[in-house]
Amino acid sequence: GSVITVDDMKSALAKIDYTLKARDIVLIRTGASDYNDEDRYLTDHVGMSAEATRWLIEQDCLVTGTDAPTYDAPVWAMFKTKSIWPAHKVMMSEPYWHIENLTNLGDLPPHGFKLSVFPIKWVGTTGAPVRAVGIIDV
């Protein structure tokens, strides 16, 4: 039920010795996809904080993704704190997009790959399922 903070993001970047560049796409591997076929997938994951989301936008990273079922903390944690979809709501005032339920992030290198995202063409919605494909130059 915890959230990823700005300090968590900075620490993770330092760990892989990487400095964000404008228009980088940031994919966050929380480990949740390791148990996405279990009930706890919906209740036991880490989400992004609104502050960390805004920080990524300030770094000119406008697309992010996570292997968790939602970009925010689990629904039960949001109800407990009475803060519903805070990271999602950043989209109401900032131009960014996020992708949820990603899998196989551990098969990608920490950086240096391309990402293509193919959404289903739905009309009148704010979201749709996608096929996300990591492209690694060899």
Task: Please place each PLM-identified region on the residue numbering.
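Active-/binding-site microenvironments in catalytic and ligand-binding cores
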Residues: G1-V138
